[in-house]
Amino acid sequence: MAYTQSKSQKVGYQAGVKDYRLTYYTPDYTPKDTDILAAFRVTPQPGVPFEEAAAAVAAESSTGTWTTVWTDLLTDLDRYKGCCYDIEPLPGEDNQFIAYIAYPLDLFEEGSVTNMLTSIVGNVFGFKALKALRLEDLRIPVAYLKTFQGPPHGIQVERDKLNKYGRPLLGCTIKPKLGLSAKNYGRAVYECLRGGLDFTKDDENINSQPFQRWRDRFLFVADAIHKAQAETGEIKGHYLNVTAPTCEEMLKRAEFAKELEMPIIMHDFLTAGFTANTTLSKWCRDNGMLLHIHRAMHAVMDRQKNHGIHFRVLAKCLRMSGGDHIHTGTVVGKLEGDKAVTLGFVDLLRENYIEQDRSRGIYFTQDWASMPGVMAVASGGIHVWHMPALVDIFGDDAVLQFGGGTLGHPWGNAPGATANRVALEACIQARNEGRDLMREGGDIIREAARWSPELAAACELWKEIKFEFEAQDTI
């Protein structure tokens, strides 16, 4: 039987393909306080108008598809569609611009970073009309933030648990990252903690391999921590990596860490996924466990200036999903990181209210609605000569993590830890006395080295080591 369309059915619907900009480019739209706002860096294919490319991003990341569909008549399209409300040309870039898109809150499941990212970045990055696309920033409305738990504990609760105030915390990643037996691994942990560090850490790819099963590592590390605490009188910790093939196995490892009375565990939030991370974060709050987050795989998404997802977006997503620490780069070490950009997303992790500041890459004012902050972790190619700059750049609410800068000390692990602790204490004292760490940092370290042979040896070993490469991710 042939289908015949009535006259009434023809009204308001016409099959076919039409330009995205006719529906999704809405320069007269005023964003609502409840909208999620996105800033995309768009590079369209040659010949594609800016308005059409921007509207295509809005459509494909919300309600649109490539052709008109009659089921649009069964919903309120104007209520649910993403709206490109502004286009901002980029100086010096002929075929690149920033597209500002507003998404109605009802498009997203409450408390789900997974669903939010699936919608906003899940499909549109493969769109043929675009040569490249990068999500630069998101504005998360308070109405949506209130559906998330956020970090298990936050900065202040962590300090109260550790009874450590007025300075950054010191950490160390155990090296070599792979190949040590569990017993030798525990020995290295003990030596570093006894020497003066607050934390030691599993590297991101230590899970449960043939040379070192997770349960054995946990047992030897727990023994090392209890011994170091008894000798130093300080609370110590080790980031036990509970990242696992399944969520069930992840929680099993977390439970065992709790049985051993460990204060903190660790998770690789990108490789494991946001669903697993949010699950673990909620478990940590319920069980009084701090959660350290490693960002393994982040540079796959955020390193290229024109395509991917900027780390400030990943940082916001992590704060929502939950974590008490996250690696942020160092500015001065071996890993990529422009100072202004890095401090921009460090503030987005730690502060409660951050104003728009394009000089630091912050496209939107962000109110975190009293959600606890996340402690920044500076890690990657740092040593004692970097200490003054690190303290000046990151302030107190950070973990300064020296892997090779501890274990590479010529006298061994414990002296390496002592050298870092002495350098940190000297910088904190100098700062509190009003000295300029950036201008006088070298003198401060040399003065401390006169009475600390461990620091003197470290200074001599690493005096020529620098990582001077131009940052790729700039404003």
From Swiss-Prot:
Where in the cell is the protein located? Carboxysome; Cytoplasm
Which keywords accompany this UniProt record? Answer: Bacterial microcompartment, Calvin cycle, Carbon dioxide fixation, Carboxysome, Cytoplasm, Disulfide bond, Lyase, Magnesium, Metal-binding, Monooxygenase, Oxidoreductase, Photorespiration, Photosynthesis
Q: Which GO terms label this protein's molecular function in UniProt? A: magnesium ion binding; monooxygenase activity; ribulose-bisphosphate carboxylase activity
Catalysed reactions, semicolon-separated = 2 (2R)-3-phosphoglycerate + 2 H(+) = D-ribulose 1,5-bisphosphate + CO2 + H2O; D-ribulose 1,5-bisphosphate + O2 = 2-phosphoglycolate + (2R)-3-phosphoglycerate + 2 H(+)
User: Which residues are the active-site ones?
Assistant: K175, H294
Site residues, Transition state stabilizer = K334
Chief subcellular location: other
Cytoplasm recorded as keyword:
yes
| Free-text remark on how the cofactor is bound | Binds 1 Mg(2+) ion per subunit.
Query: Which cellular component terms (GO) are annotated to the entry?
Result: carboxysome; cytoplasm
Q: How is it modified after translation?
A: The disulfide bond which can form in the large chain dimeric partners within the hexadecamer appears to be associated with oxidative stress and protein turnover.
Quote the record's binding site residues for substrate. Answer: N123, T173, K177, R295, H327, S379
Q: Which cofactor does it need?
A: Mg(2+)
Task: Please indicate if the UniProt record lists Transcription as a keyword.
Answer: no
Enzyme Commission number(s) of this protein? 4.1.1.39
Q: Which residues bind Mg(2+)?
A: K201, D203, E204
One Gene Ontology biological process: reductive pentose-phosphate cycle
Modification sites for N6-carboxylysine: K201
User: What task does this protein carry out?
Assistant: RuBisCO catalyzes two reactions: the carboxylation of D-ribulose 1,5-bisphosphate, the primary event in carbon dioxide fixation, as well as the oxidative fragmentation of the pentose substrate in the photorespiration process. Both reactions occur simultaneously and in competition at the same active site.
Provide the family line. Belongs to the RuBisCO large chain family. Type I subfamily.
Query: What binding partners and quaternary form does the record give?
Result: Heterohexadecamer of 8 large chains and 8 small chains; disulfide-linked. The disulfide link is formed within the large subunit homodimers. Interacts with assembly factor Raf1 which helps form the holoenzyme, most interaction (and folding) occurs in the cytoplasm.
The record's annotation in PANTHER family points to: RIBULOSE BISPHOSPHATE CARBOXYLASE (PTHR42704), RIBULOSE BISPHOSPHATE CARBOXYLASE LARGE CHAIN (PTHR42704:SF17)
Other noteworthy facts: RuBisCO folding and assembly commences when the nascent large subunit folds with the help of chaperonin GroEL-GroES. Both RbcX and Raf1 help folded RbcL release from the chaperonin and dimerize. Dimeric Raf1 binds to RbcL(2) leading to an RbcL8-Raf1(8) complex. RbcS displaces Raf1, resulting in holoenzyme formation.
Question: What name goes with this protein?
Answer: Ribulose bisphosphate carboxylase large chain
Origin organism is Thermosynechococcus vestitus (strain NIES-2133 / IAM M-273 / BP-1)
